[in-house]
A protein has these predicted regions:
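N-terminal, positively charged/glycine-rich alpha-helical extensions of SAM-dependent methyltransferases
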Residues: 1-18
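Class I SAM-dependent methyltransferase Rossmann-like catalytic core
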Residues: 14-28
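Conserved alpha-helix/loop element of class I SAM-dependent methyltransferases that forms part
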Residues: 28-45
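Class I SAM-dependent methyltransferase SAM/SAH-binding core
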Residues: 49-51, 55-108
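A short acidic, Gly/Pro-enriched loop at the edge of an enzyme's catalytic core
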Residues: 111-118
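Short catalytic micro-motifs in class I SAM-dependent methyltransferases
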Residues: 123-124
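A short glycine-rich, Lys/Arg-flanked "PGG" loop and its adjoining helix->strand segment in the class I
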Residues: 133-144
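C-terminal alpha-helical "lid/dimerization" subdomain adjacent to the S-adenosyl-L-methionine
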Residues: 151-210
Length: 220
């Protein structure tokens, strides 16, 4: 087994442009998932925080959805933040001038109180071990009437379901044209070292404890 980089940000930051290709080859229905998330966002938010902007896979659709919004994009990897900044500047220069780009871990980033109409994230929150603490801070950061929308990798509610889910992921990654053996091993090493997957029911419980209401899962 190969050594995984010290942090998740090291792992993804080292990929740069290759991350775009890998995420499409390793995550089933990635584009459909992003489209579903966008479809459930408010039409005209004024302030949006994205936790884990990566290379802009969700960031650019967010800006396309609400180009007049003020965005804050946060990621633990400086390389990923700069990649998202460059892509936003290229495709949406006016929005990029209003946007804030932050290199920080979610656990350390100061979100403030009543700052955002929307807090959102794509395939990032499973890197956080204490999700309850993060959810409480997100709840404080959201304005009255605001919303928290995210997509992520979860664990199964039972060991059997979890094993079946991961086997489905591996089958997808091993399909012709998707991931190489080395890429799959790297993903497995990374998951073992850095991921903290949580069942859907536990997410619901932690979100409710944090003060969220109207909690739902609209796609899985």
């Amino acid at each position: 087994m190969s050594d995984s980089p010290r942090t998740a940000s090291d792992y993804f930051g080292a990929m740069g442009f290759e991350y775009d290709s890998l995420i499409h080859r390793s995550v089933p229905c990635y584009d459909a998932m992003i489209e579903k998330l966008i479809n459930y966002l408010p039409r005209h938010p004024q302030t949006v925080l994205e936790l884990g902007c990566g290379s802009g896979g969700l960031s650019l659709p967010l800006v396309r959805h609400a180009p007049h919004c003020e965005f804050t994009f946060v990621d633990a990897s400086e390389e990923m933040v700069e990649l998202t900044r460059a892509r936003t500047q290229e495709h949406f220069p006016e929005t990029a001038r209003r946007a804030t780009f932050v290199t920080a871990r979610f656990e350390e980033y100061s979100m403030g109180r009543d700052q955002f109409d929307v807090v959102t994230s794509s395939i990032s929150l499973h890197h956080v071990e204490d999700k309850g603490a993060l959810f409480r801070r997100v709840r404080e950061a959201i304005k009255s009437g605001g919303t928290f929308r995210f997509v992520d990798q979860l664990s199964g509610g039972t060991e059997a379901n979890h094993a079946r889910m991961w086997q489905g992921m591996l089958d997808f990654e091993r399909a012709p044209g998707n991931c190489s053996d080395a890429e799959i091993q790297g993903l497995l090493d990374h998951a073992k070292a850095h991921d903290h997957h949580t069942p859907l029911a536990a997410h619901f419980h932690l979100l409710q404890e944090a003060g969220f209401v109207g909690i739902d899962c609209v796609w899985r």
